[in-house]
Amino acid sequence: MKKQRNLRSMAAQAVEQVVEQGQSLSNILPPLQQKVSDKDKALLQELCFGVLRTLSQLDWLINKLMARPMTGKQRTVHYLIMVGLYQLLYTRIPPHAALAETVEGAVAIKRPQLKGLINGVLRQFQRQQEELLAEFNASDARYLHPSWLLKRLQKAYPEQWQSIIEANNQRPPMWLRVNRTHHSRDSWLALLDEAGMKGFPHADYPDAVRLETPAPVHVLPGFEEGWVTVQDASAQGCMAWLAPQNGEHILDLCAAPGGKTTHILEVAPEAQVVAVDIDEQRLSRVYDNLKRLGMKATVKQGDGRYPSQWCGEQQFDRILLDAPCSATGVIRRHPDIKWLRRDRDIPELAQLQSEILDAIWPHLKSGGILIYATCSVLPEENSLQIKAFLQRTADAELCETGTPEQPGKQNLPGAEEGDGFFYAKLIKK
């Protein structure tokens, strides 16, 4: 039997690691969830994701409710109060239970002497909630985004920035990709219906299904057998542009965790696929995905800037470059991105993308197709990146996606319920 743990203190410590130490929630949360019961896993996730989604609001409230911020060894208490405020504002947990569990969290983090302080701050919020929220809703903090990102979105999308941030602040839907080598989408939807769940097909992407209500993967029909994979609809759109064919040599660059590698093999089972990623740890997930779906690909660790080190002089019929990016299109799915990214990261990422594009282009056969994709919404990483590449690369031609002046196709977060995503299809003359 698993030890009873205080979920509020665990969530507070996880959020502190993200905000103060720059760690990714996707790395921190899974090992924490292993320590709690199945019924508590979802609540722990809700508390972590929810606090990070609304962090600027919770921070603003604490600054109003407390004369001095908690610092040093007491900093975790700041995040514990955030967890308490989040429960009072956004969950159906009865207020008395939210308060009691949060106050008890002080014992779990070895700060029992601060139980009275935590209780006092949360009760003060309850008394002043109406006037505090009215003041908050008139402040810039109401957008729940860091100021540098807000400015970039306002500049890039003067008409749409508000709808982008609204989408970023929502909970994401759960999209699946039906493995067409096992089932048609309709036949798998029938299995889903038999299992007592409901799904909706995407209008444009033939394998995509949106669940009416997100569910654990182990309850999905045939998940362990490889019949279905979790993948956002916008990410599935890459295959429409890549259009892989049997017998071709195809490179999936920056491939981890392998969702697009396996999608290529579902569409073209006899393609010769090479999947490359710089992160050896994340490559283990590519192997896991290939194994679950019963597929084979050549998997290599390598830096996209130096392809000769891992593929020699080899050339490919098609290349999918899912470039390293700011991930500003998937904030609703990974709210920690708002607090992990810095303004200075954007030019650095744009430079890295440029170097990878220039390095990999010679490894595309004449007449071959390269899909440049990111999960960003920032022009510096997307349309401006491709525009500059076309200007300096004589044998590169834009195909089907935009114009030379405004190259690529930009999906914004929430459009057709998908993530923010960018694609550009390039052909080598």
Swiss-Prot record:
One Pfam family, short name: NusB
Principal location listed in the UniProt entry: cytoplasm
GO cellular component: cytosol
Keyword Heme (UniProt): no
Catalysed reactions, as listed in the record: cytidine(967) in 16S rRNA + S-adenosyl-L-methionine = 5-methylcytidine(967) in 16S rRNA + S-adenosyl-L-homocysteine + H(+)
Enzyme class, UniProt record, top EC level: transferase
Top-level taxonomic group: Bacteria
Protein keywords: Cytoplasm, Methyltransferase, RNA-binding, rRNA processing, S-adenosyl-L-methionine, Transferase
Binding, S-adenosyl-L-methionine: C254, A255, A256, P257, G258, G259, K260, D277, D303, D322
InterPro entries: MeTrfase_RsmB-F_NOP2_cat, MeTrfase_RsmB-F_NOP2_dom, NusB-like_sf, NusB_RsmB_TIM44, RCMT, rRNA_ssu_MeTfrase_B, rRNA_ssu_MeTfrase_B_ent, RsmB-like_ferredoxin
Family statement: Belongs to the class I-like SAM-binding methyltransferase superfamily. RsmB/NOP family.
Xref: PANTHER family: NOL1_NOP2_SUN FAMILY PROTEIN _ ANTITERMINATION NUSB DOMAIN-CONTAINING PROTEIN, NOP2 YEAST -RELATED NOL1/NOP2/FMU SUN DOMAIN-CONTAINING
Protein name: Ribosomal RNA small subunit methyltransferase B
Biological source species: Escherichia fergusonii (strain ATCC 35469 / DSM 13698 / CCUG 18766 / IAM 14443 / JCM 21226 / LMG 7866 / NBRC 102419 / NCTC 12128 / CDC 0568-73)
Gene: rsmB
